[in-house]
Amino acid sequence: MGRFIFVSFGLLVVFLSLSGTGADCPSDWSSYEGHCYRVFQQQMNWADAEKFCTQQRKESHLVSFESSEEVDFVVSKTFPILKENFVWIGLSNVWNGCRLQWSDGTELKYNAWSAESECIASKTTDNQWWSMDCSKTYPFVCKLIV
């Protein structure tokens, strides 16, 4: 009986130490502030990248940003591995006429505009957002709510 309690306590300690460390994210995804992020190096147009993100996991879309700290985290993941200067982010007016919104439906609270257009790419070297032709192909970042 004592051994069972010891093993059970050990498993509880391991479980508690893993909670909040990214253990809730799928493998190959990075955790930040209750969300998971993954950089995909393959190049797609905006619509295909958004579709690809939604097919990865339920509640996954092209990345949306709520703060400059979140942008800095994503840049820290994208800049070291990408050779491209731009990545698609989830901001566009594809789904909602002229009103820009994130592909996951959230409203635009934080922005870092360089220009305005249908589909927005983030420049990996200076964190600015650029309007791009939606048919151009770039790597992209998916964001998953956990």
Curated annotation (Swiss-Prot):
Intracellular or extracellular location(s): Secreted
Cited PROSITE patterns: C_TYPE_LECTIN_1, C_TYPE_LECTIN_2
Residues annotated as signal peptide: 1-23
Pfam families found in the cross-reference section: Lectin_C (PF00059)
PANTHER family in UniProt: MANNOSE, PHOSPHOLIPASE, LECTIN RECEPTOR RELATED
Record function comment: Snaclec that dose-dependently inhibits platelet aggregation induced by ristocetin or low-dose thrombin, but not by high-dose thrombin. Binds to GPIbalpha (GP1BA). In vivo, also dose-dependently induces thrombocytopenia of mice and platelet counts remains at very low level even after 18 hours intravenous injection.
Keyword Kinase attached: no
Protein name per its UniProtKB record: Snaclec jerdonibitin subunit beta
GO MF annotation list: toxin activity
Gene Ontology cellular-component annotations: extracellular region; other organism cell membrane
Gene3D superfamilies tied to this protein: Mannose-Binding Protein A, subunit A
Subunit structure, interactors included: Heterodimer of subunits alpha and beta; disulfide-linked.
InterPro entries reported for this sequence: C-type_lectin-like, C-type_lectin-like/link_sf, C-type_lectin/snaclec_domain, C-type_lectin_CS, CTDL_fold
Tissue spec. comment: Expressed by the venom gland.
Positions of the C-type lectin domain: 32-143
Cysteines joined through disulfide linkages: 25-36, 53-142, 119-134
Family of this protein: Belongs to the snaclec family.
Any further remark recorded for this protein: Negative results: does not induce platelet aggregation in either platelet rich plasma or washed platelets under high-dose conditions. Does not inhibit platelet aggregation induced by high-dose thrombin. Does not react with polyclonal anti-GPVI and anti-GPIIb antibodies.
Keywords assigned: Disulfide bond, Hemostasis impairing toxin, Platelet aggregation inhibiting toxin, Secreted, Signal, Toxin
GO biological process, any: venom-mediated suppression of platelet aggregation
Lineage: Eukaryota, Metazoa, Chordata, Craniata, Vertebrata
